[in-house]
Regions:
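Short linear sequence motif anchored by a di-proline
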Residues: 2-188
Length: 188
């Protein structure tokens, strides 16, 4: 079962589908085991440090990383394209993954991950204007959202920065999710 909550008008412009909430430390430990060292946010927006779960040496590990995949040739942790313009890489459409210069290599290498989330927010457009809706599991257990991870090395400092993106796909066949996002005749 699913709980859907309408978000207050005050939050309307800030949240949209660029927001999710990570479970608190106690719930993370209960559901995922040992916590990583480092700091992360519980209320997530793009480019914040969050958590993802990946396979490691026959097991799994929670990793602190930046939400927003950084292309390999980017000169900054703010994702940029070949032309130097800022990219939105926090969500990646599954349908185009293999052909993407940002996501293609991690996809082919099988760098899938699970993103722990207490809830996530999507824009409802049934009224003709966006109204943020928060989705959470009815039983209160966290979601495990599909993701893809990579590691980027800062060319100026040599620091290794894990990063990740949330996988999305067309949901027109799912009645509730079909109501989300502004209708776009150019996209399936």
């Amino acid at each position: 079962p699913l709980h859907i909550y309408s978000i207050s008008q005050a939050c309307q412009n800030a949240l949209m589908c660029t927001n999710y909430q990570i479970p608190n430390r106690e719930r993370l430990t209960l559901h995922y085991g040992d916590l990583p060292h480092g700091e992360w946010r519980e209320v997530m927006s793009p480019l914040y440090r969050g958590l993802f779960l990946r396979a490691n040496d026959g097991g799994q590990e929670l990793v602190v990383g930046q939400w927003g995949m950084i292309p390999p040739r980017s000169t900054s942790s703010v994702p940029t394209g070949k032309d130097g313009k800022r990219l939105s890489t926090f969500n990646a459409r599954r349908e185009g993954m293999a052909r993407s210069w940002t996501y293609g290599e991690p996809w082919r290498r099988g760098q899938r991950c699970i993103i722990p989330a207490e809830s996530y927010v999507e824009p409802y457009w049934g009224t003709g204007r966006h109204i943020p809706w928060r989705f959470a599991r009815a039983g209160g257990a966290p979601w495990g959202l599909a993701g893809l991870w990579s590691e980027w090395i800062d060319p100026s400092t040599g620091e290794l920065l894990p990063n990740y993106t949330m996988l999305t796909q067309n949901c027109d066949a799912v009645p509730v999710l079909n109501l989300m996002h502004r209708p776009d005749p150019k996209r399936p």
